[in-house]
């Protein structure tokens, strides 16, 4: 019989294993213990000496612990990938351990919770309780178990148990698991394979991962080849014959296209911002009318341009020299959109001089023509605000420059013409609201400016004609209210006088002909009156819309019989209107079109053949009668209606 003095961290289970005594035998021998699961340091424990020979046996414990060791080994092998697999073993100890071991487990848990938890962290060297964890985890990690797997079970347990607690400090992750592993001393021998398996798996995973990742990385092509088909120098528009350098927007420019040339037909060297058309040789920049035979460059909307129309050609059947935003087709030779304007023309306030014509405020001078505010100068024509300069024509805000023509917001440039919102470019005509400008005809509200004709309210300025309110002045024709004066024709109210024609109410006098109050005139100034755009109202009036692409667009509110007319040069829509009959048999429209409403070719008393409502966003606006592109035959009703 031996007497063991309990030390910190000792439990009956540890003492039994230390001396190789059966736990039940040790428990029966020490009957003085009121609670075998709770022993205090300094207590004397009787250890029977008869069972000393059990130390030399292969199984340090009784038969039930051997079974437990086997089960624990199986459990550990299953849980090898996780270093916390010992926690999984705890479940096995409660379930698979025989009943004789359950009190020991309870005792160890209580003692471990009370004493060892504090002392394991503070003084782990003196405690035997750390021993199973040392053996369970310290040995497989250090791989010392190759030499001493059996010795720690048999003789090493007595002296070395107290010497090996410092190893626990190295492996402090085991401290989390200290509370439940007084029983886990036996499964030490199966753990040596666990460590190499962990290392082997990790190394293999790293190797395999590197092998798997490396080929993928090697397969991945650097530089993120995003856009195939981009061959050389960011050449956006095809058909560029010879000298496309950098971002060239309009291809097929023959000889000397220098710096943002807006109006073609300049004889030899188009340099700087040239605004006036009828430049003979080199058509560069925004040419609106197609049918140029030879050199169709960049965003040509209508084909059949004979010779050298470059960039943004909108209206077909222009024979030779169409320059800068020409809207009306069937112009024989040299129809210029901004007629009667001498290149060094009216300038805006706060504008640097030497601008060819109509520039907005806060614009750098020497711009070819109509630019929006906050635009870098030297732009070919009609650009949006916050745009990079030197763009061929009409670009959207926040767009990359050097786009051939009408682009959408947040759209890639180089779109041929009229595009939908958030749509890919190269749409021929009829665009919806929130569309880019420079549309052949009939645009919806919230459209970008630089439209050839008929624009809706809330449009950007610098349109060849018919601009909305809050538009910069010096526009060739038809401007909205709050416009600067000296406009060629059709200005809105709150406009300075000296306008050639069509001014709104609250306007200075000297207006040539009628405009509806608060309405966009939408009439083409100085155009050949070759067609009756509105069959019901044919009038020898230069301010009519000639031959537009699409349905005929008649002059807005011009030459309409009305007794209550203002004493202006030409009939204006009645300011005080009564129920009147135009004599055409159609309904009479008492009010002028409101901003945002459908701006169609319907004059005040035109028989409504088109929708009364503006096209909704997302739907294409189609011309009601496409065949009647060039007007309808004059009917007898026109003769009755004309005054």
From Swiss-Prot:
Ranges of compositional bias, category Acidic residues: 634-643
Location of the region described as 14 X 12 AA tandem repeats of I-M-D-N-N-Q-[MP]-P-N-[IM]-M-P in the Swiss-Prot/TrEMBL record: 354-521
Presence of the UniProt keyword Cytoplasm in the record: no
Domain of life: Bacteria
Protein name in UniProt: Spore coat assembly protein ExsA
Induction of its expression: Expressed in the mother cell during sporulation.
Organism lineage: Bacteria, Bacillati, Bacillota, Bacilli, Bacillales
Segments of this protein annotated with the region 4 X 8 AA tandem repeats of Q-[IV]-K-P-Q-K-E-[MV]: 113-144
Occurrences of domain LysM (ranges): 2-47
Region (7 X 13 AA tandem repeats of P-Q-V-K-K-E-N-V-G-N-I-V-S): 238-328
Function: Required for the normal assembly and anchoring of both the spore coat and the exosporium layers.
Gene3D superfamilies to which the protein is assigned, alphabetical: LysM domain
GO BP term (any one): sporulation resulting in formation of a cellular spore
Sequence ranges of the Sequence repeats: 113-120, 121-128, 129-136, 137-144, 238-250, 251-263, 264-276, 277-289, 290-302, 303-315, 316-328, 354-365, 366-377, 378-389, 390-401, 402-413, 414-425, 426-437, 438-449, 450-461, 462-473, 474-485, 486-497, 498-509, 510-521
């Amino acid at each position: 019989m031996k007497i063991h003095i309990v030390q910190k961290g000792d439990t009956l289970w540890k003492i039994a294993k230390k001396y190789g005594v059966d736990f039940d035998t040790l428990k029966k021998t020490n009957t003085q213990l009121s609670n075998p699961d709770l022993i205090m340091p300094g207590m004397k424990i009787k250890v029977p000496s008869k069972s000393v020979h059990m130390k030399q046996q292969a199984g340090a414990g009784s038969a039930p612990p051997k079974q437990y060791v086997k089960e624990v080994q199986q459990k550990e092998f299953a849980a090898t990938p996780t270093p916390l697999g010992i926690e999984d073993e705890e479940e096995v100890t409660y379930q698979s351990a025989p009943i004789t071991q359950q009190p020991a487990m309870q005792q160890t848990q209580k003692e471990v919770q009370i004493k060892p938890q504090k002392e394991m962290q503070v003084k782990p060297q003196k405690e035997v309780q750390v021993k199973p964890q040392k053996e369970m985890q310290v040995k497989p990690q250090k791989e010392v178990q190759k030499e001493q797997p059996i010795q720690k079970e048999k003789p090493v347990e007595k002296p070395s148990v107290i010497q090996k607690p410092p190893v626990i400090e190295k492996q402090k992750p085991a401290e989390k698991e200290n509370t439940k592993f007084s029983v886990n001393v036996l499964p030490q021998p199966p753990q040596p394979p666990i460590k190499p398996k962990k290392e082997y798996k990790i190394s293999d995973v790293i190797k395999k991962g590197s092998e798997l990742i490396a080929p993928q990385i090697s397969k991945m092509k650097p530089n993120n080849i995003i856009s195939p088909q981009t061959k050389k120098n960011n050449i956006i528009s095809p058909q560029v014959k010879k000298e496309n350098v950098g971002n060239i927007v309009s291809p097929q420019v023959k000889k000397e296209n220098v710096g943002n040339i807006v109006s073609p037909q300049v004889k030899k060297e188009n340099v700087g911002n040239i605004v006036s058309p009828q430049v003979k040789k080199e058509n560069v920049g925004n040419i609106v009318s197609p049918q140029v035979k030879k050199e169709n460059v960049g965003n040509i909307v209508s084909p059949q341009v004979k010779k050298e129309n470059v960039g943004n050609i909108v209206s077909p059947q222009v024979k030779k020299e169409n320059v800068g935003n020409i809207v009306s087709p069937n112009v024989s030779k040299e129809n210029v959109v901004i007629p009667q304007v001498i290149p060094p023309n009216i300038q805006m306030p706060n504008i640097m001089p030497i601008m060819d014509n109509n520039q907005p405020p806060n614009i750098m001078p020497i711009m070819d023509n109509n630019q929006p505010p906050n635009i870098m100068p030297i732009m070919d024509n009609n650009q949006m605000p916050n745009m990079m300069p030197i763009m061929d024509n009409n670009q959207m805000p926040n767009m990359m420059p050097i786009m051939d023509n009408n682009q959408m917001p947040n759209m890639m440039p180089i779109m041929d013409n009229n595009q939908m919102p958030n749509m890919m470019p190269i749409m021929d005509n009829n665009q919806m609201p929130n569309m880019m400008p420079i549309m052949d005809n009939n645009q919806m509200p919230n459209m970008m400016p630089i439209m050839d004709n008929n624009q809706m309210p809330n449009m950007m300025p610098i349109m060849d004609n018919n601009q909305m309110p809050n538009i910069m002045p010096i526009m060739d024709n038809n401007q909205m209210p709050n416009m600067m004066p000296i406009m060629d024709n059709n200005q809105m109210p709150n406009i300075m006088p000296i306008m050639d024609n069509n001014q709104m109410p609250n306007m200075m006098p000297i207006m040539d002909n009628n405009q509806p109050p608060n309405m966009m005139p939408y009439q083409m100034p100085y155009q050949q009156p070759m067609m009756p755009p509105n069959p019901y109202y044919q009038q020898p009036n230069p301010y009519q819309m000639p031959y537009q692409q699409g349905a005929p667009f008649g002059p807005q509110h011009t030459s309409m019989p009305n007794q209550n007319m203002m004493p202006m040069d030409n009939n204006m829509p009645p300011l005080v209107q009564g129920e009147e009959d135009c004599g055409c048999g159609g309904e009479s429209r008492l009010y002028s079109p409101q901003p945002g409403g459908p701006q169609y070719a319907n004059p005040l008393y035109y028989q409504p053949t088109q929708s009364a409502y503006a096209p909704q966003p997302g739907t294409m606006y189609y011309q009601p009668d496409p065949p009647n592109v060039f007007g309808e035959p004059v009917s007898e009703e026109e003769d009755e209606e004309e005054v």
